[in-house]
Curated annotation (Swiss-Prot):
Upper taxonomic lineage: Bacteria, Pseudomonadati, Pseudomonadota, Betaproteobacteria, Burkholderiales
Motif position, 'HIGH' region: 61-71
Protein's gene: valS
Top-rank EC class of the record's enzyme: ligase
Domains: entry comment: ValRS has two distinct active sites: one for aminoacylation and one for editing. The misactivated threonine is translocated from the active site to the editing site.
Provenance organism: Bordetella pertussis (strain Tohama I / ATCC BAA-589 / NCTC 13251)
Protein name: Valine--tRNA ligase
Length: 960
């Protein structure tokens, strides 16, 4: 605003606007907070104090990605914690960063090149990587800009990118040290291979999907001719050969053996015998291994060590040849029979099955449901592939000279949780963490991609490997080894999760022993979804403890995943995603449809997605503002459970923001211009009650933050502000201001403004923008800041409960008053009085209580007068009993007309009950209708029955 004081983004003389307009407020205040340095670490240290550090690291989002609902949820929780601890006086460090996201980013750029009919191989590695850097520079700021929109009070000067020079140095140093310690090695292993991307993928990046497939039963004839066995029923059976069942007949071309259980009496005498491998000019042996289930199928399986994970382990145990029959793009290679060479794997399957049938090796084919592994990035069916890869040894003891000699990195990670140095919230995730680590395999960290941290290993012409921090260092190693020829760098890159796992310490300057590293490691808490506990959480624990000796964080808060209102996973292909920025700013229907149908992997889905979107959001999505979205996310943040996101909750919390805004306007209108910065004034029981309730709120909010129960924090704030402060206290305060003595008016005005000021501080971590805007006005009146001074609620002390301010007497008095008001309102409803009609009340009971409550009853229950009597008149009117008081409205009514009205209502309700009972008594309806419809009908029946009972009671009281 142009006429605001210097460095003060509010016009102190201007009245608070009539409506809450979040867009203007959010931009103005976020920039102001950042400019003033409120987000910077060490801000409090400069004052000479030494507060404890409170540190949170961003789970780094993909640099070229955009914000999704999971990010919004995570950011709300993290920023809420950071703002809370900043107000507690802690030295807060909220470290932002982005991940280079190897596979995801490379796919995006390759798609752009595909549109130009260019492949990455056409460009070559160097030019392709340049293209990716260009794309990163163009779009890399999108997601950090969106994070700012959410109000994240991050220490932006510390922002990192996982491939910047500082982080890359830490990655290379970690790799070299682990290699020198024998904990990183290169070997030929079976890995999940994506034949489209031409790279290995992590086991954790495999999505298993149930599909309808087939089971082919294939005969492998005995080389020595038919053999006899004794079957499970004791019968002697002559076999031409062994029959096996497989879902992948094309892989039989790589079979190395058949296998039975060593204790299976049917086949013991056949061990060591040879069978013909159909379609191939070779014989394979029958071996025994206890991994075979003798009761499944024929009790005999084929061993294809190079193309099946179970078979691979068995083949290694028995020294069975590992024959690779697929090229890296999943075509039959030179190891397969000539007639199949060059065929794509599924074409090969058809050809193999046809030839098996033609040569009478195919016994039968059965339909079979099976789990099919697909890459989560490409959706392509993955292939177990035997390739040279780099691995981290997860179970190998660390050597002498390391920080944990004699213990594997997995063992150290398990101990850190077992002894309490790291705690999970909720605690049950400890069990999952332990199960994963106790069944861990060596981690394949190499990827056959071009975008990422290139593995720091160089090869001489004779195959020697030199692992070094730089090419110069590798050449020094080569010269020392007597190698003088050129060196070639390993073309592979590191798994993205390798560099991400180093974030807890590389962001603070490691491998240097920096002051930041000493002060800010470990982090206070990691906030994450359960889906990356192993991807990221466990690996951070392992590598941070191995490289630094410190745990990476003290607490791990694990939250559920955001799903749509029906509990479905949000995904682009389902067309049910929501962009948090669209909830903040709003979006029209046309824009929403365009966003949901653009760039689909399967364009045919666009029509159905558009139809569903138009049905669900006929008017688009209104603008809710950041605060309403954050409040919604906080309210959803129960421990561990998945969240079914309903847009109506956003609407409810936007209404809350409006309610808080309007309440503040009312308070300011009744307090501005009054000297309220000192003490004095007489407090009513209502004033003392709202202050007492404030202590309970402050205690509940403190517990909520301590226990990571953000839902409790949000719900407590909502109840207090909406129910107690706005719906009750403001109405009671009006009576005091209108009818009280000057001393009473002063006491109430001071209570109004001081309680509101405390509420704004309490709510700030959850809804930062509206609380800042309102606090600037309220704090002036409350004496918390002086005119023209630069101040912010974000660095004010956080309210703490004061047990001395708890007032049980005032609590009881207001509870009794509430009951009396609600009783009179019930009488009004019972007598069908219009809200505008003021009527007299006759009350019998304790004179002191009723006299004290009279002005409040009259105002809140819309009464023309309140008469306290020794005994209620016998007027045949309905009476409400509240404790020792009996209340009756003195209203002349046409008894006959009222009886007729009630009789008509009774008849209507009885009809509705009969209809509901008819539906629920119909077995066909109950069995066929959706469960939700049946439950709705049961609820209707219960409501009609309850109302009928009340109406009949009213009718009986009239007695005519």
């Amino acid at each position: 605003m142009t006429d605001a004081a210097p460095n003060q983004p509010v016009n102190e003389s201007q009245e608070l606007s009539k409506s809450f307009e979040p867009a203007e407020i959010e931009t103005r205040w976020y920039d102001e907070w950042a400019k003033r340095g409120y987000f910077d670490a060490g801000r409090h240290v400069e004052t000479g104090t030494d507060p404890q550090p409170y540190v949170i690291q961003f789970p780094p989002p993909n640099v070229t990605g955009t914000l999704h609902m999971g990010h919004a949820f995570n950011q709300t929780i993290m920023d809420g914690l950071v703002r809370y601890h900043r107000m507690l006086g802690d030295d807060t460090v909220f470290v932002p960063g982005t991940d280079h996201a190897g596979i995801a980013t490379q796919i995006v750029v390759e798609r752009q090149l595909d549109a130009q009919k260019v492949s990455r191989h056409d460009l070559g590695r160097e030019k392709f990587v340049e293209k990716v850097w260009e794309w990163k520079e163009q779009s890399g700021s999108t997601i950090t800009g969106q994070v700012r929109r959410l109000g994240a009070s991050a220490d932006w000067p510390r922002e990192y990118f996982t491939m910047d020079a500082r982080m890359s140095r830490g990655v290379a140093e970690t790799f070299v040290r682990l290699y020198q310690q024998g904990l990183i090695y290169r070997g030929k292993r079976l890995v999940n291979w994506d034949p489209k991307l031409l790279t290995a993928v992590s086991d954790l990046e495999v999505q298993s999907e149930e599909v309808d497939g087939h089971m082919w039963h294939i005969l492998y004839p005995f080389v020595d001719g038919p053999q006899t066995i004794t079957d499970q029923d004791g019968n002697t059976v002559t076999l031409r050969g062994m029959t096996i069942a497989t879902t992948r007949p094309e892989t039989m071309l790589a079979d190395g053996a058949l296998c039975v259980h060593p204790d299976d009496p049917r086949y013991k005498h056949l061990l060591g015998k040879l069978v013909e491998l159909p379609l191939c000019d070779r014989n394979i042996p029958i071996i025994a291994d206890d991994f075979v289930d003798p009761d499944f199928g024929t009790g005999c399986v084929k061993i294809t060590g190079a193309h099946d994970f179970n078979d691979y382990a068995c083949a290694l145990r028995h020294d069975i040849p590992l024959i690779v029959i697929f090229t890296l793009d999943a075509h039959i290679n030179e190891n397969g029979p000539k007639q199949f060479q060059g065929l794509e794997r599924y074409e090969a399957r058809q050809a193999v099955v046809a030839e098996l049938q033609a040569q009478q090796y195919l016994v039968k084919v059965e339909p079979h449901k099976m789990m099919q592994p697909k890459g989560d990035r490409t959706g392509v069916v993955l292939e177990p592939m035997l390739t040279d890869q780099w691995f981290v040894a997860m179970s190998k003891p660390a050597p002498a000279g390391t920080l944990n000699p004699g213990k594997s990195i997995t063992e150290v990670a398990l101990e850190a949780v077992a002894d309490g140095r790291i705690a999970f919230y909720p605690e049950n995730w400890t069990t999952i963490y332990n199960q994963w680590l106790n069944n861990i395999q060596d981690w394949c960290i190499s990827r056959q991609l071009w975008w990422g941290h290139q593995i720091p290993a160089w090869y001489s012409e004779d195959g020697q490997v030199f692992v070094a921090r730089s090419e110069e260092e590798a050449q020094e190693q080569a010269r020392a080894a007597g190698v003088s020829g050129p060196l070639t760098r390993d073309p592979d890159i590191l798994d993205t999760w390798f560099s991400s796992a180093l974030v807890p310490f590389t962001t603070f300057g490691w491998p240097e022993d920096t002051p930041d590293l000493r002060r800010y490691l470990p982090s206070s808490v990691l906030v994450t979804g359960f889906d990356i506990i192993f991807f990221w959480v466990a690996r951070m624990v392992m590598l941070t403890m191995h490289m630094t000796g410190s745990v990476p964080f003290k607490h791990v808060y694990v939250h559920g995943l955001i799903r749509d209102a029906d509990g479905q996973k949000m995904s682009k292909s389902k067309g049910n995603t929501l962009d948090p920025v669209d909830l903040i700013d709003g979006i029209d229907l046309k824009g929403l449809v365009r966003k949901r149908t653009f760039g689909l992997m399967h364009p045919k889905q666009a029509g159905a997605i558009e139809k569903a979107t138009r049905r669900q959001y006929p008017d688009g999505i209104p603008a809710f503002g950041t605060d309403a979205l954050r409040f919604t996310m906080a309210a959803y943040a129960t421990l561990g459970r998945n969240i079914n996101f309903d847009l109506k909750r956003c609407e409810g919390y936007r209404n809350f923001c409006n309610k808080l805004w309007n309440a503040t306007r009312f308070v300011l209108m009744n307090t501005e211009g009054h000297a309220l910065d000192g003490d004095g004034g007489e407090l009513s029981f209502a004033d003392r009650w709202i202050v007492s309730q404030l202590q309970a709120l402050e205690a509940e909010v403190e517990r909520g933050f301590a226990d990571y129960r953000f839902d409790n924090v949000a719900n407590a704030l909502y109840r207090y502000v909406w129910d107690e402060y706005c719906d009750w206290y403001l109405e009671l305060a009006k009576v005091q201001i209108q009818q009280g003595t000057p001393a009473q008016q002063l006491g109430t005005r001071r209570t109004l403004i001081r309680v509101l000021e405390a509420v704004l501080r309490l709510a700030h971590p959850v809804i930062p923008f509206i609380t800042e805007e309102l606090w600037q006005k309220v704090a002036l009146v409350a004496g918390k800041r002086t005119a023209g001074a630069v101040a912010s609620v974000s660095v004010q002390p956080y309210p703490r409960a004061n047990p001395q301010a708890v007032d049980a007497e005032a609590e009881a008095a207001v509870a009794e008053l509430k009951s009396q008001v609600e009783a009179v309102r019930a009488l009004r409803g019972e007598m069908n009085l219009s809200p505008a009609q003021r009527v007299p009340l006759v009350a019998e009971g304790p004179t002191d209580v009723l006299s004290r409550n009279t002005p409040y009853l009259a105002a809140l229950a819309k009464l023309s007068e309140v008469e306290v009597v020794a005994a209620l008149p016998d007027a045949g009117a309905p009476v409400q009993v509240v404790g020792d008081a009996r209340l009756m409205l003195h209203v002349e009514i046409d008894v006959a007309a009222e009886c007729a009205r009630l009789d008509k209502e009774i008849a209507r309700l009885e009809g509705e009950i009969a209809k509901a009972n008819g539906k629920l008594g119909n077995a066909s309806f109950v069995e066929r209708a959706p469960a939700a419809v049946v439950e709705q009908e049961k609820a209707r029946l219960a409501q009609f029955s309850e109302t009928l009972e009340k109406v009949r009671g009213q009718r009986v009281k009239l007695g005519v």
